[in-house]
Swiss-Prot record:
It catalyses: (4R,5S)-dethiobiotin + (sulfur carrier)-SH + 2 reduced [2Fe-2S]-[ferredoxin] + 2 S-adenosyl-L-methionine = (sulfur carrier)-H + biotin + 2 5'-deoxyadenosine + 2 L-methionine + 2 oxidized [2Fe-2S]-[ferredoxin]. [4Fe-4S] cluster binds at C66, C70, C73. It comes from Rhodopseudomonas palustris (strain TIE-1). This is Biotin synthase. GO terms for molecular function: 2 iron, 2 sulfur cluster binding; 4 iron, 4 sulfur cluster binding; biotin synthase activity; iron ion binding. Keywords: 2Fe-2S, 4Fe-4S, Biotin biosynthesis, Iron, Iron-sulfur, Metal-binding, S-adenosyl-L-methionine, Transferase. Belongs to the radical SAM superfamily. Biotin synthase family.
Amino acid sequence: MNSIAHSTLAAASPTIRHDWTREEAAAIYHAPFADLMFRAQTIHRQTFDPNQVQCNQLLNVKTGGCAEDCGYCSQSAHHDTALPASKLMEPAKVIEAAKAARDAGATRYCMGAAWRSPKERDMAPVIEMVKGVKALGMEACMTLGMLTDDQAKQLADAGLDYYNHNIDTSEEFYASVVKSRSFGDRLDTLEKVQDAGIKVCCGGILGLGEKPTDRVEMLRTLANLPQHPESVPINMLIPIEGTPIAKTATPVDPFEFVRTIALARIMMPKSDVRLAAGRTAMSDEMQALCFLAGANSIFIGDTLLTTPNPGDSKDRALFNRLGITPRDDLGVHAHS
């Protein structure tokens, strides 16, 4: 192990930093697997209960027809994926679905709309959704695309807890994935959200054709923000027929995926690291390694936007095998 990796992996306690170098982050990622896992688990235990996992549920409140050209996404209007576009859901139906998610064990409800950015006419029903979810005693999260300063403020005033806005991959590889917006556009919205006082949920996707360097740089970008994202979702690509990346995607080696989780935990020790999309393609053993590496959050339910998810019964069985219990930050199940 080189001296850079050794000094970081041997650190006595987790430190919040915003000055990670390329060399340092890469050295940690490529460290011997046992050393990497030991350090990630040590840091994880100093901040979180290793036997508790935070549970979220995600609902697509507006499907398809998106003006962006993200090469992996079935909801882009640029791709022929046979996914019909839908109108924005009625707030009452969203709130009803959120209550069912709460009763199933979710403490945070995430709502996604397939937009480049919301129009002003969309803000009133979106705000009603946020307020309705909050009234259930849950945390509310939304992903609506790029925001203006005023829209971020409106969401903050409504009580929105989290805003999801992934950077997907490294800045260097980004143009190979998305051409309708820039990497800087993503960072600009993150800044607006944080300035409004909303917590940030931001991560990326593995399996887009990126190199390990791109995974390291994606996490280094997030770890070097003035404030770490409070939640860092790590997705494994589920190739969708009709999307450009489905033709060129390469499967991610399970150990490389686990290394990415561990690096996120080490570089952002107080952030929730979410094992997000792609769990249907992961064995129980791979998911267990991810939890050991510092993942402490998942999405529950049968679907994530337009892709499959293991479902509550499989997750309960996995949790039982591993001795994991859902983390109940807010005591929401006192209402159930």
